[in-house]
Amino acid sequence: MLLILAQWLQDDFGFFRVFNYITFRAVMATVTALLIGLAAGPWVIRKLSELKMGQAVRTDGPLTHLVKSGTPTMGGVLILIGIFVSCMLWADLSNRFIWIVMIVTFGFGAVGWVDDYRKVVRKDPKGMASREKFFWQTLIGLFAAIYLAFSVSEINNLKVLELFFEWVKSGFALDLPAKTNLLLPFMKEVSYPLGMMGFIILSYLVIVGSSNAVNLTDGLDGLVIMPVILVGAALGAFAYVMGNAIYAKYLLFPYIPGAGELMIFCGAMGGAGLAFLWYNTHPAQVFMGDVGALALGGALGTIAVIVRQEIVLFVMGGIFVAETVSVMMQVVWFKITKKHFGEGRRIFRMAPLHHHFELGGWKETQVVVRFWIITILLVLIGLSSLKLR
């Protein structure tokens, strides 16, 4: 919105030309989202408390968590407010990538909000039924995956729908002008051709998988938000490089017109995340809830797909991956041993992984900070792939 105003004024007032720089608007988006979150935080927390949006705590978990019972949840709304307002102010609203990431973010946020609402207000411990949640996640994820398959290229955005129908009529065999190769990090000009269907399937798995992985990681005060900020910032750097023809050519990346604008979204997400951390740091005044975790995870996955860094996301988000794998291993092993031995056995003391370390004697703050440190190292490894090829 401000970009439109600045472009109208820049001929008369030269200062407004600075708004044409993505880096400037990314910084301002970060600061704006941060200030909005810090200012609105007390009001949001107070309203959540008045509405009795208190988090129920598992009785079979670490005993230290029992004191958290009743802490307001659904604080992810605070993050989404900051992202929305900041992007509306600083992003180029004609950019299709901004809108698809916003749609996925707020779509998953809506799913999370319904899940939280049923858990907290209706006192239903299961929240949204697994099949219902999976249906809506699949609907949003497939929509984004199919759209991106036809738009991550230099085609006119208005042709996306037309090309989609042509692809369907061809029996999913039409060769379309879309960049669907899987880029292999640390390798110079090496990629794996996925084809249109392969791209759609991979994109869907990355978007939905990332959303659920971040949600599983959200279990301790401040645990998930810092990795989200760090990974988001790194993806913003990739977006800036691949959205710039000169930098993309120099670093041997495919040029994706318009991708650089995602740096503004990543900045807004980082600023809103820092504001949330101000109130979520131990002892937390508010929890993120599914409304925030599902939304942020979906955003990371979508951005990674757009900039073709799915494998790098897997590396940088190693904490999210480890948490998810720990749950999968625990469930599968429990079912197998129950079938063969009559009682279920566990690999971990408790899943997700952060609870395993808690029950092993680590304090909550130790788990959180150590997971942050691991994420910093993984993000640095991911960023090194910009040059080490």
Swiss-Prot record:
The chain crosses the membrane at residues 25-45, 73-93, 97-117, 135-155, 190-210, 222-242, 258-278, 286-306, 311-331, 366-386. It catalyses: UDP-N-acetyl-alpha-D-muramoyl-L-alanyl-gamma-D-glutamyl-meso-2,6-diaminopimeloyl-D-alanyl-D-alanine + di-trans,octa-cis-undecaprenyl phosphate = di-trans,octa-cis-undecaprenyl diphospho-N-acetyl-alpha-D-muramoyl-L-alanyl-D-glutamyl-meso-2,6-diaminopimeloyl-D-alanyl-D-alanine + UMP. GO terms for molecular function: metal ion binding; phospho-N-acetylmuramoyl-pentapeptide-transferase activity; UDP-N-acetylmuramoyl-L-alanyl-D-glutamyl-meso-2,6-diaminopimelyl-D-alanyl-D-alanine:undecaprenyl-phosphate transferase activity. Its EC number is 2.7.8.13. PROSITE patterns: MRAY_1 (PS01347), MRAY_2 (PS01348). Its main location: membrane. InterPro entries: Glycosyl_transferase_4 (IPR000715), PNAcMuramoyl-5peptid_Trfase (IPR003524), PNAcMuramoyl-5peptid_Trfase_CS (IPR018480). One of its GO terms (biological process) is cell division. GO terms for cellular component: plasma membrane. Belongs to the glycosyltransferase 4 family. MraY subfamily. This is Phospho-N-acetylmuramoyl-pentapeptide-transferase. It comes from Polynucleobacter asymbioticus (strain DSM 18221 / CIP 109841 / QLW-P1DMWA-1). The gene is mraY.
